[in-house]
């Protein structure tokens, strides 16, 4: 049983904790919180031991919460650490704590690529993470782009260049201090946005440029993609490649999927925890082939898309399971769509 310690229990961390707990070969050794708030109560109710930073122990005790120990205790009690801290905090934790221990650590996409030896996406480069000490699961948008490109390349559809235009959600649902509320903000105004270079940390040879704006929604990101392929492929061949790749979902307008909100409503109706949708949701009707040009639109659920990637990263760094076996196990335990998918 792999003991997984999770540093951070926010939007991503709490989802990773639940996902790890659902795996038959993993156990949540504990979670780390820096604030003694309601999320501590949630973690405790789920049976997770709660740790904190050394300088926060007394604050927890004053709030009537006895922590299981400090971050160093959590590291000692774990075979691998997943750091789901806010942006840049993971790098600080690496310097202060992780560097003292010979334990693998998995960071999130909010950290700079230099924090790790490998930037990770399960479909694209699972085996590159084997035996590594520091691995970084790329961000939600980068994960979405990488999955789409890899789904084509795994099925023999070559990509000469990719141009992706991103409408980013302004904030996560619980982030009441963020926006915009009534605006569209270049994010950034310069070209490329950071997503393209980030994709290249995984897919080294891809020719990609990205642009992004932030919009006043909280549900999902929307990507509009133009891909130049290495030849003229039938639309059916492209759709087949997408349909049989794990963690890709084809949404049909004729079935009622006319917006991203309906994708999330579908997840809720399915009874998925928190209404999460870890798959990339590609609008089938948008998939258009014109010679060697491919156009498509797809949604990325920023709160959950990286969760299965973190689970697979645990097995990858420890060499615990082959790539496709891990991906299939993760998808099955998290109840993602597996029918018609090819694992291998």
Swiss-Prot record:
Keyword set, alphabetical order: Cytoplasm, Glycolysis, NAD, NADP, Oxidoreductase
CDD domains reported in the protein's UniProt record: GAPDH_II_C (cd18127), GAPDH_II_N (cd02278)
Tree of life domain: Archaea
Transmembrane parts of this sequence: none
Subcellular location: Cytoplasm
Residues noted as binding D-glyceraldehyde 3-phosphate in the record, renumbered to the chain: 139-141, 195-196
Gene Ontology biological process: glycolytic process; lysine biosynthetic process via diaminopimelate
GO CC annotation: cytoplasm
Pathway, per record: Carbohydrate degradation; glycolysis; pyruvate from D-glyceraldehyde 3-phosphate: step 1/5
Pfam families: DapB_N, Gp_dh_C
Active-site feature positions: 140 (nucleophile)
Catalytic activity: D-glyceraldehyde 3-phosphate + phosphate + NADP(+) = (2R)-3-phospho-glyceroyl phosphate + NADPH + H(+); D-glyceraldehyde 3-phosphate + phosphate + NAD(+) = (2R)-3-phospho-glyceroyl phosphate + NADH + H(+)
EC number(s) from the headed UniProt entry: 1.2.1.59
One MF term in the entry's GO annotations: 4-hydroxy-tetrahydrodipicolinate reductase
Record-stated family: Belongs to the glyceraldehyde-3-phosphate dehydrogenase family.
Subunit structure of this chain's protein: Homotetramer.
The protein's name: Glyceraldehyde-3-phosphate dehydrogenase
The species this protein was found in: Pyrobaculum arsenaticum (strain DSM 13514 / JCM 11321 / PZ6)
Phylogenetic classification of the source organism: Archaea, Thermoproteota, Thermoprotei, Thermoproteales, Thermoproteaceae
